[in-house]
UniProtKB/Swiss-Prot annotation:
This is SsrA-binding protein. The gene is smpB. InterPro entries: SmpB, SsrA-bd_prot, SsrA-bd_prot_CS. GO terms for biological process: trans-translation. Required for rescue of stalled ribosomes mediated by trans-translation. Binds to transfer-messenger RNA (tmRNA), required for stable association of tmRNA with ribosomes. tmRNA and SmpB together mimic tRNA shape, replacing the anticodon stem-loop with SmpB. tmRNA is encoded by the ssrA gene; the 2 termini fold to resemble tRNA(Ala) and it encodes a 'tag peptide', a short internal open reading frame. During trans-translation Ala-aminoacylated tmRNA acts like a tRNA, entering the A-site of stalled ribosomes, displacing the stalled mRNA. PROSITE patterns: SSRP. It comes from Chlorobium luteolum (strain DSM 273 / BCRC 81028 / 2530).
Length: 157
């Protein structure tokens, strides 16, 4: 009898909703993240936040700063700091390419979302982004309102 294949879908754990509003996304890249077991359990329960988090590059390593992971309530062995720096896993060539773009153009690395892949590993989608000015944010809001208005008109007919 054939063995049933177990298929896991990509489950989106957490998302940084403000990132697309406050930044102009130029390029995205997916990276692995180095976590401890209790942190993975917390993320699976949805007790994590990417708000106000960003990535930095130090000594050819990428670090995710200010990612909030609430400590797992059943872990009594070690108390971890909720906003500690976490290492992101990328190839050296990718890190050097990102470093050069950040240095020459004044761009920022921000996380857009974190999700579990088909193997159950947590991945972080990073974006190479440029901060929006206030008038750019207003244009985004106007465009969204116009789109909503058009949708309402289409529903009426």
């Amino acid at each position: 009898m054939a063995k049933k294949q177990q298929t896991r879908s990509y489950t989106e754990a957490i998302q940084n909703r403000k990132a697309r509003y406050e930044y102009q996304i130029l390029e995205t890249i997916v990276a692995g993240i180095e976590l401890l077991g209790s942190e993975v359990k917390s993320v699976r329960l949805g007790k994590a936040s990417l708000n106000e988090s960003f990535a930095t590059i130090h000594h050819d390593e990428v670090w995710l700063e200010n990612m909030q992971i609430t400590p797992y309530e059943f872990n009594h062995l070690d108390a971890l700091e909720p906003k500690r720096s976490r290492k992101l896993l990328l190839h050296k060539e990718e890190i050097r390419r990102l470093q050069s773009k950040i240095n020459e153009k004044g761009l920022t690395l921000i996380p857009l979302k974190a999700f579990f892949d088909k193997n159950g590993r947590l991945k972080v989608e990073l974006a190479l982004a440029k901060g929006k000015k206030l008038y750019d944010k207003r244009e985004t809001i106007k465009g969204r309102e116009n789109e909503r208005h058009l949708q309402q008109l289409r529903k009426q007919y």
